[in-house]
Amino acid sequence: MKKLLSLLVSLFLLTGYCFAATTNSYDKYGSKTGSYRTNGSTVTQYDKYGNKTGSYRQTSSGYNSYDKYGSKTGSYRKTSSGYNSYDKYGSKTGSFKTNSNGVTTKYDKYGNKVGSFKTDSSGRTTQYDKYGRKVESYK
């Protein structure tokens, strides 16, 4: 849940990716893994069976994430270079930064690279692990 919401935030906020009413996610083999639906400033996440798994909502300083029951699980705060992520207690868990080429890199709380995201000309955004291996895509 936290991982997927982190991916969503990185896509939605940092790559300039514009979510349609419904955006689907796929694993590296092309099988659907879930979907995201927008309603104003709220994005709700569903698994591949259509069950709600979480959401995030815009705030004055960034975004908050919630589990499927509506309990806050974390937050994302805008910085000069991207966003920092925090757990529900306010402890920093990582960060997202976008370079001049539009590639978004995710770092853990120690500053180690843990993954990246790239969007192609068709609008498909692909997530890679720290070794450059494809993990998931969004379209």
Question: Where in the sequence are the language-model features?
Answer:
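Intrinsically disordered, low-complexity proline/glycine-rich segments
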Residues: 19-139
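Sec/Tat signal peptide C-region and signal peptidase I cleavage site
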Residues: 5, 15-20
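Bacterial N-terminal signal peptides that target proteins for export
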Residues: 1-8
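Repetitive helical segments and hydrophobic/amphipathic motifs
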Residues: 11-12
